Amino acid sequence: MEEKKNNLKALRAMRGQTQEEAGESVGVSGYVWGKWERGVSFPDVIEIKAIEEEYNVSYNDIIFLNNNTV
């Protein structure tokens, strides 16, 4: 799950978003998004679907996105 938390940060950084902006874009708070980035909790299936749609990425992209992208 380490990859997922880093990749969420990378997706957010590519757009120049704050955690609050990223969270709001997928229907959660910035606090929740931050917990995902830190690996404290993880998005559920519905939230992953929202991330896929908002960021135009697949589940595999979320998991395997190259961390050098940031």
Task: Pin down the residues of each PLM region.
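Short, charged recognition helix plus adjacent turn
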Residues: 1, 10-16, 24, 31, ...
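Recognition helix of helix-turn-helix/homeodomain-like DNA-binding domains
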Residues: 27-43
